[in-house]
Amino acid sequence: MSPTALVTGATGFVGAALTRQLLRSGWSVAIVTRPSSDFSAVEDFISQVDAYVYDGKTQSIIEILEKVRPDVVFHVASLVLTQHTPEQVESLISSNVLFGTQLLEAMVLAGVKKFINTSTTWQYFGEENKQSVNLYAATKKAYEEVIDYYNDAHDISVISLVLSDTYGIGDRRVKLINLLIDAVRRDEKISMSPGDQIVDVSHVYDVVRSFESAAQDLIEATSTVNLKFAISGARLSVKELVAEVERVSGKKINAEFGGRAYRIREVMAPPVLPLYISKWSKVDLGEGIKELLNSKVK
C-alpha cells in the first residue's frame, strides 16, 4: 500500500516540486491550501491530489488531519520576507508560527507521528550562528522551539531540512540565478553587490529528493527522532556564479559589481551544519544552468 503525504505550501515552487516528486514515486498526496491560494502553477497535478482548504482556524486543520491521517506531514509553507514592515508582523507570526503549531496540535489529535519541517540558513547568523538574519528567520527559529515541545511531549518524530538557495524551471521568485539568466537572455546590465559573498545553490530536484528520502527515514525509524540537516548543493561566490552562467551560456553578462551595496545583515557565507547525504547523483550546477537557459518557462 502506498504511503500518504500531507503537503503544506504545495502551490509554491518547492512545495509544488515536492508534490510532483511524491506523485511520481507513487505516494497518495493531500495538500493544504488557503482561500487565496493561486493554483496557476500546479494545474498539471491538481487533479491528482486531494486539496483541502485551511481557513486559519485550529479546528479547520484538525478536521483535515482527521480526514487524511497521513503517514508523513511535509511542512513547506511559509511567508518569506527578506525585510518586513510593521503591517507584515501579524502575517509573519500567523504563517510561520501559528499555522505550524495548529498543524502539530492536529497531528497529535489524529495520531500522526512523522513530520518533515523546512528551515532556512538565515536562522544561523553572527559569529556563533545564534542570531537570525531577519524577522522571517526569527519566526522560523521560534517555531522550532514549538516543534521541540511536540517532539518531547507527544513523541512526534521530526526531521528539519535547512534550505539555502534553490533554483529550477518554473521558479517565479526573484532569485539571483534567475536574474542572471534573464540578463543573458535580454543582454541587459545588472547592478550587483561586490559579489564576494558565498552562496549555496541547490537544484530543486535534489531538494525534493532529500525531502522524500528523509520521509522514508522517518517511516523506517524504530524510535522517536528529532534531527536537523542542511541540504547543500554548489558553494561558490556570487562572482563565481556569474562566471559559471557566462561559461555555460557562452555570453558575457554585463554585471556591475559594486553597483549596489551589500544588504543590511548580508550573509557572507552559509553556516556549516550537518549535511543530509544524498543517495543519488546530484544535479551539476552547470547542467542546471543549461536547463534554465534552454527552458521557455520564465
Residues covered by each model-derived region:
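N-terminal Rossmann NAD(P)H-binding glycine-rich loop of SDR-like oxidoreductase domains
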Residues: 5-25
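SDR active-site strand-loop-helix element
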Residues: 8, 32, 73-77, 115-121, ...
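Conserved glycine-rich Rossmann-like NAD(P)H-binding loop of the short-chain dehydrogenase/reductase
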Residues: 27-37
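NAD(P)H-binding glycine-rich loop region in Rossmannoid oxidoreductase-like domains
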Residues: 53-95, 127
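Conserved Rossmann-fold NAD(P)-dependent oxidoreductase catalytic core, especially the SDR/UDP-sugar
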Residues: 75, 98-136
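Active-site segment of SDR-like NAD(P)-dependent oxidoreductases
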Residues: 79-83, 119-128, 164-167
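NAD(P)-dependent short-chain dehydrogenase/reductase
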Residues: 135, 141, 145-199, 204-212, ...
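C-terminal substrate-binding subdomain of Rossmann-fold SDR/epimerase-dehydratase oxidoreductases
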Residues: 188, 192-298
